[in-house]
Regions:
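Iron-associated oxidoreductase/ferritin-like identity signal
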Residues: 1-101
Length: 101
């Protein structure tokens, strides 16, 4: 998550990212959103303070919206992404059907 110890984490490169580099960066951003959801929900589950739980769950849900935005951008930048994700979903559906669920 935070990279406060890395003095170069906020430094801009001396050139623009290539499309492939941007795609990798967006994948990393997407992973960070999922990690944030996990962290905030774990904190919410670990407390019985009602206001803290409500705020943490609300923030986690906002991160899920961000994840959707990054996923959509990734699908637009890498056209094969949506097809591969759909293939993965089909494989899970096949397993589900074999189990009769």
């Amino acid at each position: 998550m935070p990279e406060f110890l890395n003095p170069f984490s906020g430094k801009l490169p001396d050139r623009k990212l290539t499309l492939e580099e941007l795609i990798r960066a967006i994948r990393l951003d997407l992973a960070a959103e999922h990690e944030a959801v996990h962290l905030y929900m774990a904190h919410a589950d670990a407390t019985d303070h009602p206001l803290a739980r409500k705020v943490l769950i609300d923030i986690a849900n906002e991160e899920r919206v961000h994840a959707g935005e990054f996923q959509r951008l990734l699908n637009l930048l890498a056209p094969d992404e949506a097809n591969l994700m759909a293939k993965g979903a089909e494989e899970v559906d096949e397993m589900k059907n074999k189990l009769g669920l």
